[in-house]
Amino acid sequence: MKIFFVLLFLLASLSQLAVAVEKEFSEEQISKKRQSFTLAVLPDTQFYCDTRLKLSEKWGNGDLRHHFFEQTRWVRDNQKRLNIAFLVHEGDIVQADAPEEWAIAKEAMSILDGHVPYCLCLGNHDMGFQKSNNKYGGDIAVNRTTHFNKYFPREKYAQTKEFGGTFDPKRHDNSWYHFDAAGMKFLIVSLECKPRDEVLDWANKVVAEHPEHRVIVLTHAYMRAN
């Protein structure tokens, strides 16, 4: 019987605590905390931008760029219905770092501009292309050169409220963004493919400066084979 009364007392105390906690927040804050939201993710769109090696064409799939446009258009058109707070692209944006491929990617991603905030990270297909006699017609990621910054320039994204900063003040490769959703603060750290130690040091500092944020690390590949 004593156990029953103790449990009853604890339950009553907890219910009063819950009411007291809720009173500390406004109705608007409580509503936001209970609200669901969506984080949209785009992975590996390289075959939608396959103009240099034309592997998709060789394998019988043809020009697939319309899929890229349809995907970002769908995200834009469903932003309100799904409360899409942010979109991340996980890299391998293009097939072989060709300017015409980046032009396709730019057109597709620009559909989101002014509707859904987004950020991107680089994959191995997005950098360091070099022609070769292999079965694909070229090697990728032989170095870190990329056309990404021409088509997704830092100065454009620095104008958005979600933009936080970059590792290199002149480049957009390694960046951080932030957004609020469901009463929570989020920090996205976008890292290059197989990030260098100095980039990781920078990322750690960014995270340390935002102790109240939930952190999302966005990268196409974190570890090197060796």
Regions found by a protein language model. Give the residues of each.
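Bacterial N-terminal signal peptides
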Residues: 5-15
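N-terminal active-site segment of His-dependent metallophosphoesterases
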Residues: 19-100
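His/acidic metal-ligating clusters that form di-metal
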Residues: 32, 71-86, 168-173, 178-180, ...
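Structured segments of extracytoplasmic/periplasmic soluble domains
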Residues: 42-48, 71-81, 96, 108-115, ...
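Extended active-site neighborhood of metal-dependent phosphoesterases/phosphodiesterases
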Residues: 57-58, 98-201, 210
